[in-house]
């Protein structure tokens, strides 16, 4: 894959920074707000809630930074897709909610699902040379 069209390299860099940067920042929140997030994870029935919050934060930070800088992007995109899919199903189970909570959980579920799509798109091009990237792969 080449980025031959005008502005494609910059657009791809912006996509990496926006998607990866937001998810890495979200991951940092898992570390700074671990207690509150662990309580919510326990409420949702997640085993080992504190460890799960820390682990998911690690996936988000690793995956996000990986995409932004272009280091092992296949692993980073895979980590993000995994986190987003699992958390959509386990944390945003709108089918078990009622009333206003149902709509909020459905919105979060759908955000995670389109995030899975974006992560899979990055995974699909992970084997190509990325512009403005460190270019370290596996």
Residue ranges and their predicted role:
Residues 1-36, 48-62, 69-138:
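Extended, low-polarity transmembrane helix blocks
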Residues 39-46:
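Short amphipathic alpha-helical coupling elements at transmembrane boundaries
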